[in-house]
Amino acid sequence: MYTLYAIWSRPSDADIDAFEAHYTKTHAPLASVVPNMRRFMTTRTTDGLAGGDPAFYRVAEMAFDSKEALEHAEESEQWAQVRADAGQMIERYNVTMSVAIGSTDQDNGGAL
């Protein structure tokens, strides 16, 4: 698997409800229909290790069969819509989004 992680910073307290409404009702549904995607998951972080604050607020995981499958998805209209919406969210809610991409190791019950 080849996985893209979109890692969002925390919006201000005043913007959290609006950010969540937009993320769950608009952004995630747009992202969920990107072609060639094998799996789409989102997480809203609430806790950090040992009770600390989490280092980020939201994480989206988009898994593809290969780097080439992701590259093909990046050429789609759906991808363009997700990118445009992410840019609008960054501006509107004064957040950042970092992206990490790479091959996914799978542990099938043994050591990696």
Q: What are the language-model segments listed below?
A:
Residues M1-L112:
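Macromolecular interaction modules
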